[in-house]
A protein has these predicted regions:
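Short sequence motifs at beta-strands and strand-loop junctions characteristic
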Residues: 21, 118-126, 174-177, 226-232, ...
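Solvent-exposed loop segments that connect transmembrane elements
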Residues: 23-120, 156-172, 210-223, 261-275, ...
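Residue-level signature of outer-membrane beta-barrel architecture
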Residues: 3, 17, 124, 132-135, ...
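Membrane-spanning beta-strand positions in outer-membrane beta-barrel proteins
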Residues: 2-4, 8-14, 22, 131, ...
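Hydrophobic, lipid-facing positions within transmembrane beta-strands of outer-membrane proteins
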Residues: 1, 126-132, 169, 179-183, ...
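C-terminal beta-signal and adjacent terminal beta-strands/loops
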Residues: 204, 307-318, 336-385
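Membrane-embedded beta-barrel scaffold of Gram-negative outer-membrane proteins
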Residues: 133-159, 172-239, 255, 260-262, ...
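Gram-negative outer-membrane beta-barrel transporters
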Residues: 7-11, 193-205, 209, 222-318, ...
Length: 385
């Protein structure tokens, strides 16, 4: 909804209601207990459909035996007796070794916690957006915005896995929430030949969802609400049409970021307060200059040069999973002809053949990088029918 208080001052209010449920279904198990096309016993793995059905019961899956279902409310001693009757050998081994055919007390306690696993990760609520805008003249607009956002929660396949320091992989993640405060402007200056749009912003991130790979806890990826964080920044774009040289246009854009993890929410040194967020270069900018002129044949010709720069950043907030994404600078040029019905453009992207890193990770203790395309030369043709 929009409200005009005066011809210069207005307000806009928006809201969106969400009711989201995220579920997991299926199985992740071995085939040892399924000889000769027998029914799947869901053994030596996780019966995900059974775990996340919310009925408060769960069948033991670390043995080929036809095990009884355990119900919520059962005590540890009662569960221990059931396991001992089912497979006394494995229970006895669990007192001394950690092996697939050893049932430890920690594993039994994990099954008891799994009895309380939810049916779905549910989230509902309303997010809001408020904007006030003030236009003192036809050439200038100021605005202030408050907005909210969130991502739905998740379910973890290895929920309940135990780590050092009493850490336990959660069965269900909470939403992570964003609150944004922004002050922006749109301005035409120098007789309309210079345009400068931009904004300054502050963002609070609560309960940031993060995917983790830590074999000391479990040999699977899992997610958790790992940290709270803050983002401060300024961004803008500029377009200039010099009056002294008709046909020339110069443009560019920039982004300055200061990101910080303010609180860690999981008991691990793999998340560090004060570190920056992932994929958040402190400085990014691009620029271009294009010159157009009319030929005697009636065609429009142009030449253009452009460049882009990105500062270095981290690929993750989890220190054991992250790598440094190097800074890079890329250049390109184009030249072309156009008429009312067709156009042809010769282009060279990544003129200096920069090995620009667009993404990187260090998951599984192996460096993986995604690079920009190498120097690319081509011709683009377009026709209007």
């Amino acid at each position: 909804m929009s409200f005009d208080f005066t011809d210069k001052l207005s307000a806009t209010v928006g809201a969106r209601y969400y009711d989201v449920e995220v579920d997991l279904a299926g199985g992740a198990n071995a085939t040892f207990c399924n000889p000769f096309f027998a029914n799947d016993q869901n053994a030596f793995g996780t019966n995900i459909s059974d775990l996340y059905d919310g009925d408060g019961s769960l069948r033991f899956t670390s043995d080929c035996s036809t095990a009884p279902r355990m119900e919520a409310g059962i005590s540890f001693d009662e569960a221990y007796a059931i396991f001992n009757e089912l497979d006394a050998y494995s229970v006895d081994r669990g007192k001394y070794v950690n092996a697939p055919n050893a049932i430890s007390e920690a594993e039994i306690r994990g099954y008891l916690k799994a009895l309380e696993a939810p049916d779905v990760a549910a989230a509902s609520g309303t997010i809001w957006k408020f904007t006030m805008s003030y236009q003192p003249s036809d050439d200038v607009l100021w605005y202030a915005t408050y907005s909210e956002g969130f991502r739905p929660g998740l379910l973890n396949r290895p929920g309940g896995a135990q780590g050092a320091g009493g850490y336990e992989v959660p069965f269900e993640l909470a939403t992570d929430d964003v609150t944004n405060y922004e002050l922006g402007w749109k301005a035409d200056m120098a007789g309309g030949t210079l345009r400068f749009n931009g904004s300054a912003f502050f963002v609070e991130i609560d309960k940031l969802q993060t995917t983790i790979f830590d074999p000391s806890i479990v040999n699977l990826f899992f997610s958790d609400n790992a940290a709270n964080a803050e983002v401060m920044g300024i961004e803008g774009d500029i377009t200039w049409l010099p009056q002294a040289l008709p046909g020339l246009s110069i443009g560019g854009a920039f982004s300055l970021l200061d990101t910080e993890i303010t609180d860690k929410l999981i008991p691990t040194n793999d998340v560090r307060e004060g570190d920056s967020l992932a994929f958040a270069p402190e400085v990014q900018f691009n620029a271009n200059a294009r010159y157009e002129w009319n030929l005697s044949s009636g065609l429009m010709a142009h030449v253009m040069g452009h460049m882009a720069y990105s500062d270095e950043s981290y690929s993750d907030i989890i220190t054991i999973n992250r790598d440094v994404i190097d800074s890079w600078t890329m250049f390109g040029v184009t030249a072309g002809l156009a008429s009312d019905s067709w156009g042809a453009t010769l282009y060279i992207d990544n003129l200096t053949d920069e090995r620009a890193e667009l993404s990187r990770n260090y998951v599984n203790d192996r460096q993986r990088a995604t690079y920009a395309r190498p120097r690319t030369v081509g011709i683009r043709l377009n026709f209007n029918f």
